[in-house]
């Protein structure tokens, strides 16, 4: 919906048109960005030939080509199946490891637990928490005022008498990720 060009290369280069960069500098920057986004092999393809997840990466590449220090994404995995959800989140994790700050707005509590080292919670326009995702989602004093949902892992920890629940949730998410990633 935010794509305005037909071809991948043209779409990513669009933000640099009219800058003081030469065409060669633009070409190099776009190619470098497409490599980071895993789209370089498709650089001369029409955008219509891409999957939904690849199209999302094109829109992200269109921002990254400008070399921002920060990107803000609203529901980056909305409408994607689990495979594409995982692909886009691993891609964003890689960007973050390369020094790009990634801020996500999400209602997906599993995404929040698995992929964010830090969660900011706002209520009535005020910041009410700045902690780990597990700490936020295991704090009944935050869940209600921020209209968050108690996770099933927090409920399980409480019902089984596992304390602190936050540690249990973090360990479970870590183990789940290990099994999916390495099969063990």
Spell out what each predicted region is.
Residues 106-107:
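H-loop/switch region of ABC-family ATPase nucleotide-binding domains
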Residues 112-114:
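A short, surface-exposed alpha-helical micro-motif characterized by mixed small hydrophobic
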Residues 126-153:
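Conserved beta-strand-loop-alpha-helix hinge in the C-terminal portion
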Residues 143-184:
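ABC ATPase nucleotide-binding domains
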């Amino acid at each position: 919906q935010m794509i305005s060009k037909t071809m991948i290369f043209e779409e990513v280069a669009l933000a640099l048109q009219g800058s003081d960069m030469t065409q060669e500098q633009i070409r190099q920057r776009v190619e470098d960005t497409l490599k980071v986004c895993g789209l370089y092999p498709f650089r001369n393809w029409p955008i219509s030939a891409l999957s939904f997840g690849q199209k999302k990466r094109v829109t992200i590449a269109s921002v990254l080509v400008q070399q921002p220090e920060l990107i803000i994404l609203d529901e980056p995995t909305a409408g994607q199946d689990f495979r594409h959800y995982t692909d886009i989140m691993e891609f964003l994790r890689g960007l973050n490891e390369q020094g790009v700050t990634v801020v996500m707005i999400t209602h997906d509590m599993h995404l929040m637990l698995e992929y964010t080292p830090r969660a900011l919670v706002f209520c009535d326009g005020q910041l009410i928490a700045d902690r780990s995702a597990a700490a936020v989602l295991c704090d009944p004093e935050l869940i209600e005022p921020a209209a968050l949902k108690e996770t099933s892992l927090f409920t399980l920890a409480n019902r089984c008498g596992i304390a602190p629940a936050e540690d249990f949730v973090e360990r479970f998410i870590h183990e789940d990720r290990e099994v999916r990633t390495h099969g063990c």
